[in-house]
């Protein structure tokens, strides 16, 4: 296992037999990663697990790219890579580890992540434009959060990508209505999300972000949109898949007591066994 690989590196290899299985394992692994610290960005893995599983299911290893614009979502790609046997993520969140809780320019797995929210889409369209010049047909799967839509740079990038017809660009927009200051819709009105992206010239669809088959199907439809970029507005929850979370738990930054961690691991293990039965 390499600690520095990225999904677009030549020679990297993985396969996903069942993205539903992988989504559950992403959640399970994320709990294992957060448990030693007792807190962390577990909610971001819970809301994006199906999106990341679908991206790994359809992406071509060593060709396509993965960009993680909201750096605190990096836990989900890390968990997926670990479950696919690409990385050993022990030490996640510890001082000196490459597997930092908030992604940096040193982070493996993804081709780009950033500290300041709203910058990732600009980098992704740069990849798409450069790949066009190189004659590459690589797709760029780009994770974006709904809170990032409060940043003007996202909309500048959206305009640019549509103007240049960057059909290789596919945004997985995690619409979980959660950010550090509270529910997104109480801070800034960003709806109707899909209609706004469509008005900018994008192929835009609303998707149940926890239906991995629907996400995979939407990614397949996006592949046919080679003349314009695509965005999947994935409706999700930062609590999805963990019934044991207390009702007042802060989904943006979850406190995971030892008792809650054990309950979460037990619940997810049972769900995985039921899926495989």
Model-identified regions with their sequence ranges:
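Glycine/aspartate-rich loop-and-adjacent alpha/beta segment that forms the canonical ThDP
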Residues: 2-5, 212, 217-277
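Thiamine diphosphate
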Residues: 109, 113-116, 121-224
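Glycine-rich beta-alpha junction loops
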Residues: 50, 72-73, 176-177, 211, ...
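N-terminal capping segment at the start of a domain
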Residues: 22-39, 174-176
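Generic beta-sheet signal
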Residues: 64-66, 138-142, 169, 228-236
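Cofactor-binding active-site loop characterized by glycine-rich and histidine/acidic residues
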Residues: 33, 43-163
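N-terminal hydrophobic or amphipathic helices/low-complexity stretches enriched
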Residues: 2-26
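Nucleotide/pyrophosphate-binding catalytic subdomain
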Residues: 8-9, 58-62, 273
């Amino acid at each position: 296992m390499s600690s520095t690989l990225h999904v677009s590196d030549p020679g990297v290899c993985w396969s996903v037999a069942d993205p539903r299985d992988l989504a559950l394992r992403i959640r399970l692994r994320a709990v294992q990663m957060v448990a030693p610290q007792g807190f962390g960005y577990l909610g971001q893995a819970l809301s994006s697990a199906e999106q990341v599983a679908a991206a790994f299911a359809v992406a071509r290893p060593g060709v396509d790219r993965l960009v993680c614009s909201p750096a605190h979502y990096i836990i989900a790609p890390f968990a997926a890579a670990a479950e696919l046997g690409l990385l050993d993520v022990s030490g996640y969140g510890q001082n000196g580890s490459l597997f930092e809780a908030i992604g940096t320019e040193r982070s493996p797995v993804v081709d780009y992540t950033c500290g300041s929210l709203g910058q990732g889409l600009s980098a992704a369209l740069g990849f798409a434009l450069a790949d066009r010049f190189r004659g590459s047909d690589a797709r760029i799967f780009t994770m974006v959060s709904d809170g990032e839509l409060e940043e003007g740079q996202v909309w500048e990038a959206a305009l640019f990508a549509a103007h240049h017809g960057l059909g290789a660009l596919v945004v997985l927009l995690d619409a979980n209505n959660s950010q550090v200051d509270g529910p997104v819709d109480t801070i800034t009105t960003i709806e109707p999300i899909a209609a706004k992206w469509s008005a900018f010239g994008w192929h835009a669809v609303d998707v149940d972000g926890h239906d991995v088959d629907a996400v995979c199907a939407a990614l397949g439809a996006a592949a046919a949109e080679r003349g314009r970029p695509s965005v999947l507005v994935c409706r999700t929850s930062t609590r999805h898949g963990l019934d044991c979370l207390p009702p007042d738990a802060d989904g943006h930054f979850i406190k995971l007591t030892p008792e809650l961690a054990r309950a979460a691991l037990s619940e997810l293990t049972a769900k995985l066994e039921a899926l495989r039965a």
